[in-house]
Amino acid sequence: LIFPLEIPVTVWEGDSVTLNSDLTEMKDDDVIQWRFWIENTLIAEINVTADRITVYDDVLDGRFRDRLKLDKQTGSLTITNITTEHDGEYKLEINSVENFFILFVF
């Protein structure tokens, strides 16, 4: 039985943070999704097969607008200009394998 990782991340308001996928490169059939804990909202996605990278930064009243950057090689997610609205749990799903990040904003 494999338990998902839950990685605590501390960041100061106004700073940027990168949530690392720990991938060095993506494979041809990789699908990577980042979700925010409120309603399990999809905020970013890479579908290698479809050659598509998408950030959904208008969700949740636009709290992520112009703040999300997705690394096309590793799938890591950077959130810029952090506010307390970004506090909480983020789920990284790579081909159905889940890891979690808990973001603490001060």
Predicted features along the sequence, with ranges:
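Flexible inter-domain hinge/linker segments at boundaries of tandem extracellular adhesion modules
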Residues: L1-P4, W37-E39, L103-F106
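N-terminal Sec-dependent signal peptide, specifically the hydrophobic helical h-region
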Residues: L1-V9, G62
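Generic preference for hydrophobic/aromatic residues in regular secondary structure cores
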Residues: I2, I43-N47, L68
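Solvent-exposed, conformationally flexible loop/turn segments
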Residues: W12-G14
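Ligand-binding face of N-terminal immunoglobulin V-set domains in extracellular IgSF glycoproteins
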Residues: S16, D61-F106
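A short beta-strand segment in extracellular, disulfide-stabilized domains
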Residues: V17-D22
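N-terminal V-set
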Residues: L23-R63, F100
